[in-house]
Swiss-Prot record:
Signal peptide: none annotated. It catalyses: hydrogen sulfide + 3 NADP(+) + 3 H2O = sulfite + 3 NADPH + 4 H(+). Its cofactor is siroheme; [4Fe-4S] cluster. This is Sulfite reductase [NADPH] hemoprotein beta-component.
Amino acid sequence: MSSSSIEDIKGKSHRLRGSLLESLANPTTGALGESDQTLIKYHGSYQQDDRDLREERRRQKLEPAYQFMIRTRTPGGVITPQQWLQLDAIATRYANHSLRVTTRQAFQFHGVIKRELKTTMQAINAALIDTLAACGDVNRNVQVAANPLLSRAHADLYTDAAHLSEHLLPNTRAYYEIWLDEKKVAGAGEEEEPIYGPHYLPRKFKIGFAAPPINDVDVFANDLGFIAVIVDNTLLGYNVTIGGGMGTTHGDPDTWPRVGNIIGFITRADLITISTAIVTTQRDFGNRTLRKRARFKYTIDDRGLDCIVGEIQQRAGITLQPARPFVFEHNGDRYGWIEGEDGHWHLTLSLPAGRIADTEGSTLLSGFREIAQLGIGEFRMTPNQNVVIAGISPGQRAAIDALVTQYGLDTGNRAPTALGRHAMACVALPTCGLAMAEAERYLPDFNAKLQPILEKYGLAEAPILLRISGCPNGCSRPYLAEIALVGKAPGRYNLMLGGDQRGQRLNTLYRENITETEILAALEPLLGRYQQKRLPSEGFGDFLHRTGIIALPPYPTHRHVISSTLQA
């Protein structure tokens, strides 16, 4: 759909109402009307179909097996045990019997059919969780560092992020009328949208809060990032980054991924003001005529960083202070038990591509249900698609450990390679309409193919960062990985190499449109050289750059955040 069509739909939608009620009530199809397929995204859902069944249903002269993905708005991915049980029940009753943890710390339900869409939405809201603005041209789910060590500062970080998430919600009552049966009042459909305006943003907008030395949120991949400045366990404020983004288009030189620029420091008191100024700057300056160039990163590249920063400061009435020193050491999760400063313990468990389900070889859904039934602590989803069972007292650990062992919840932690423990993949086939190749379903097979090569060169415990994406939109943040596969066609991928383990450098296209056999053949000699010639503690991506095998990608944009400029 063209940019003009989408802008027209938004403008005529009566603040995101459209004809959704009529589409939902239409019994002759499992789909929504065309314009409503756009509008439902703002309510937290995508219309999809089971692509595994497309050809068979076409032969039977049936419409596609339409279904809906629903995504939660859970800032920082924090939920209570009771909420976990409610989401588990929803997944079992209305979806495909699985919970999917996303790279933005939300949950996705897949396989919901239209006639149960409203009931499912109501059940999610009954858990005191909503889906408003989880998709669409608005601010999406706000990421927050899942850092269990700095307990007090992390609590303040989460409070700020949750406050900002609420502040940036659309003002329309459409969500509550359509899904929760709120009565319309005079003026419904004409509510003021003081932040978004009648056409909302040109494209989606993503925000992340990071807590050094860990960059688990990949803060430089966000349109707007906040890097916590913590001194003596007190959160003083944030270094602000703008202009990150992963999406691109295969073969189009006018699109590219980008890492954000650090533009200065703010105190906590200025968080809402500066964020509003940044979002409204993108609202007014972003490209609404060419959708593939509508993200904030292109607004900055087209108009210039100095111009955009000047506009932000003018709107906010704030002069940004010089950025404070900080260092990121890595962007992964730390598995196993970790003690926080307050004496509580936190258990991080690695999930295969974020999928929580009971399958022939796994009882993850049942196991986490049993832990939630204990009613202790809380659950935190990580930006790496994993789960933290957080806030556990020393005396409660044994009960958790027993269930972890019984249900094999730490199987991911015990994966035979470090690469496998840290790898990520987007959902891709069969539900994502944009997928060109497999990702989540392919990840375990590809890990298994890489394992003997890694073991051959003594690299089984080398923390090499692998990410797989089914298309170039990059939901798994592949362009920051040391090794990335980006889908081109069924069974074929672009092989990207040379990111780092800190989320600060874009990788580079190494081989284009190649098969698994060709990917493994390309990687083996590089891994062999890495084993022989790497420096102590040198990452694979850093090695590729130091030895000249890989250079920065030729994008006309910001490609690398230099660590030396960030240190005192």
